A protein has these predicted regions:
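Extracellular S/T/G-rich loop segment that most often corresponds to the catalytic His/Ser-adjacent loop
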Residues: 60, 184, 205-295, 299
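Substrate-binding/access-modulating region of protease and related hydrolase catalytic domains
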Residues: 46, 121-212, 222, 266-284, ...
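Acidic, Ser/Thr/Pro-rich low-complexity intrinsically disordered segments
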Residues: 168, 303, 333-336, 376-479
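C-terminal subdomain of the subtilisin-like protease fold in secreted/lumenal serine endopeptidases
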Residues: 8, 22-23, 32-33, 40, ...
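Peri-catalytic substrate-binding/gating loops that frame the active-site cleft of hydrolases
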Residues: 33, 40, 61-86, 114-127, ...
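Protease zymogen maturation seam
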Residues: 13, 20-55, 68-69, 268, ...
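Bacterial N-terminal signal peptides
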Residues: 8-15
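Subtilisin-like serine protease catalytic core
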Residues: 42-78, 83-133, 145-148, 209-212, ...
Length: 479
């Protein structure tokens, strides 16, 4: 499986007072970063002070480790495609600059996550392609080194209607699942439609289309959705600026433009970077926002951070430039436009949801084993990011089991018991179904079953319509 670059202790950080007023870093090229005020990146802060470091991974084309604006910002850099982690394309350095360029140092640009230190994994081959195997190794490396957020600004055409272009990689999903299980948030670009057979393209790329991954689309200075940005009613979660972007470039690339004074910045770079555009450069802004939330509260889970970012977004509408955006969550911008200040306020107001201790458990292979004859607990589902939960129960032939799920407000559930022979929900067919819930009194979904064979059965709880919420699940097995 190959992917392409989607081109189209403590550190100085931000203090959050009870009633914040915007701070303006003194970086001289900040005025060229139109996306910073658009994201309200510094609007929730009125001072620069010390906050805990958050490790952020950039899985990309490498990085200029000696760039002046990244001095002291890179903890580790490694190539997973041979050679050095040096950035031959510029893509990874550009992304790294958006997130973690030094802030308020009187030089260059300002990164949007002042508390971020970088772990850079190079996964781009000399021909510009990426193997998912290299990507998966880089993800696991970053998790091992303590990353809390991983930015992946790469992907390929995804067409779920065409078996030759599904874009799915089991290796990639396993690496992402492992990262989520360790409390890491993965942020990914939803992709550009450059190679799509029709435009706009209606499907987000992988890994943005995986559960628990925050998929990010692009909009321009006029506030409208970028024509190149992939759409998706489920997997576009947020939108952030992605046109006429300004950031860092390796100085080996900018030195070829000798008449330009801003060496090391995209204004001096090759043509495709002078006014860089692409969902690749939208995702890092969300990554930076996530890093800020983790720095303010290291106890947050990845799903709590994604929820805060999603629900604090500014809804996109014709009033703020999105001509075709309908009310509510939509396929063009997801929950809306990134609003970092609003996310910080939501965190301070205690709006993060209760974490689900069973996640990730979105498929049979990572389903959570439930032991003991009786179990009763609460968990959550999210139609857009966590539509299904799987619990594994061991039954003997002839043993009886009763399952009952009570949905919270605004939730509609289906509960299915799958036979031991089914290895993945993606392969689910009627022949594997052992039982299915029937909606009973009080809205409770329930069923009873007597096992016809020994083995590990799978209880799937899924939401059947758009919504987010908590449910209670009760499982009782006979002796």
């Amino acid at each position: 499986m190959k992917r392409l670059l989607l081109i189209g202790g403590g550190v100085l950080a931000l203090a959050v007072p009870a009633a914040a007023q915007a701070v303006t870093p003194n970086d001289p090229l900040l005025p060229k970063q139109w996306y910073a005020p658009q994201d309200k990146a510094f609007d929730a802060f009125n001072a620069l002070t010390f906050l805990p470091v958050v490790r952020v991974a950039v899985i990309d084309s490498g990085v200029d480790v000696n760039h002046p604006d990244l001095k002291g910002q890179i903890l580790a850099a490694r190539s997973f495609v041979g050679g050095s982690p040096a950035d031959d394309y510029g893509h990874g350095t550009f992304v790294a600059g958006e997130i973690a360029a030094a802030v308020d140092d009187g030089h260059g640009i300002a990164g949007l996550a002042p508390a971020a230190n970088l772990l850079v994994g190079k996964v781009v081959r000399p021909d510009g392609t990426v193997s998912t195997r290299a990507e998966a190794r880089a993800i696991r490396w970053a998790v091992k080194l303590g990353a809390r957020v991983i930015n992946i600004s790469l992907g390929g055409l995804r067409d779920p209607q065409d078996p030759f272009f599904t874009g799915y990689s089991k290796i990639e999903q396993q690496a992402v699942d492992d990262a989520v299980a360790q409390g890491v948030l993965v942020v990914a670009a939803v992709g550009n439609n450059k190679y799509a057979p029709v435009k706009p393209w209606k499907y987000a790329s992988y890994p943005a289309a995986l559960p628990h991954v925050v998929g990010v689309g692009s909009y321009g200075k006029d506030g409208d959705v970028s024509t190149f940005s992939n759409q998706d009613p489920v997997f576009v979660d947020l939108s952030a600026p992605g046109e006429d972007m300004f950031s860092l470039l390796p100085r080996t690339l900018t030195s070829k433009n000798t008449t330009c004074d801003e060496q090391g910045y995209s204004s001096c770079g090759p043509k495709e970077y002078r006014h860089a555009a692409g969902t690749s450069f939208s995702a890092p802004q969300v990554t930076a926002a996530a890093a800020t939330l983790f720095s303010l509260d290291p106890t947050l889970t990845s799903d709590q951070v994604s929820w805060l970012l999603d629900r604090s977004a500014t809804p996109a509408s014709p009033d703020n430039g999105c001509a075709d955006c309908p009310d509510g969550r939509n396929a063009l911008t997801g929950w809306g436009k990134l609003n970092i200040a609003a996310a910080v306020r939501a965190l301070r107001a205690g709006q993060a949801p209760t974490p689900d201790r069973f996640e990730p458990n979105d498929d049979i292979v990572i389903g959570r084993a439930i032991r003991g004859r009786r179990a009763h607990f609460r968990a959550t589902v999210d139609f857009w990011d966590d539509a299904a939960d799987v619990y594994r129960i061991k039954l003997r032939r002839g043993q009886r089991v009763a399952v009952a799920a009570r949905p919270g407000a605004n939730l509609a559930l289906t509960v299915v018991l799958w036979k031991p022979a089914l290895g993945s929900l993606a392969a689910a067919e009627d022949k594997f179904r052992a039982g299915r819930s029937a909606n009973g009194a009080g809205g409770v979904d329930r069923f009873k079953y007597r096992a016809k064979e020994n083995g590990w059965y799978s209880v799937e709880v899924s939401t059947t319509r758009p919504g987010f919420g908590t449910y209670s699940l009760r499982i009782r097995r006979s002796r």
